Amino acid sequence: MDMMEQLSRIGIVPVIAINDAADAVPLAQALIDGGLPCAEVTFRTAAAADAIKNMTEAFPNMVVGAGTVLTCEQVDRAVAAGAKFIVSPGLNPTTVKHCQEIGIPVCPGTANPSDIEVALSLGLKTVKFFPAEAAGGLKYIKSIAAPYVDMKFMPTGGVNEKNLLDYLSFNKIICCGGSWMVPGDAVKAKDWDRIRTLTASAVQLMLGLEIAHVGINSTDEAEAMDTAAKLCKLLGWTMKVGNSSIFAGTGIEVMKSPFRGAKGHIGIKTNFIVRAKAYLERQGFEFDESSANVKDGQLKAIYLKDEIAGFAIHLVQK
């Protein structure tokens, strides 16, 4: 899996400035515990390289990159410290080419079609869009993305909990950079619990996990029809008959035959199923890959490998 795909599956890249390299490890731990094993450490401070080194040594699997990289010398320092990707506020062909020569993924900043065309000429398929909100926001990204069908964007600058979902819902955006989960005052106060809580809230906002429906197993279609009819009568819901199941409203799915789960199944809907799957895998859950429902190349649903309290659990794309 290439670096941009890893960032896409994480979804949010925390952009952080660290003044004391000793803060790097507890800050990284707070991000990981909150659900974001990723960070863009900006070269706006003298401690950046040491902070990256401390993070990558303590957490080798964390996706740590260097941001606000302006020169080839900074690229070399970041890579020597263990950075796995480079981000810059603007597009400097010299810096980009240097990254390409040494084999480090780079995501330079762009703000207009001319920048994008330079990026394309350099063979890039993903660029940072910066400063996102000040440069026109999602509306502007959509307007300039159309001619560049193969280009993906990582908007950064002004992205927050109020507009995150709008950005991520556009299929040309692979992830968003943001700092609202790592506010400067919390870092200065070494308030790692606050950062962990803000990070977890950002992840849950992004994924939007909630119960979609509960599945009830039946021995045959007649029993399923009887069960669904009674539930609809009880709740005043409408019945919808499908090939393998009958829905009572949208909250209960009655299977026409014995199905997954000793007691039935629970569907959990999410805003972004690929990101939700990756997140849950990082939490230690395993998936039954043979259960994946893929349509037009896009994952639509997939079951966990193990039942919980006798219920099979599956994710479903909203």
Role assignments for model-derived ranges:
Residues 5-17, 203-228, 261-268:
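N-terminal beta-strand motif that seeds the catalytic metal site of vicinal oxygen chelate
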Residues 32-37, 58-62, 80-86, 101-107, ...:
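Glycine-enriched alpha-helix->loop->beta-strand junction motifs that scaffold or abut catalytic
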Residues 221-235, 276-284:
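Amphipathic alpha-helical segments
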Residues 15-17, 38-45, 62-70, 83-91, ...:
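Catalytic beta/alpha-barrel core
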Residues 89-95, 128-138, 172-195:
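Glycine-rich phosphate-binding active-site loops on the catalytic face of alpha/beta enzymes
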Residues 1-81, 101, 161-162, 189-204, ...:
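Conserved N-terminal beta1-alpha1 strand-loop-helix module at the mouth
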Residues 251-256, 281-318:
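Vicinal oxygen chelate
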Residues 27, 71-81, 114-122, 139, ...:
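Catalytic cores of alpha/beta
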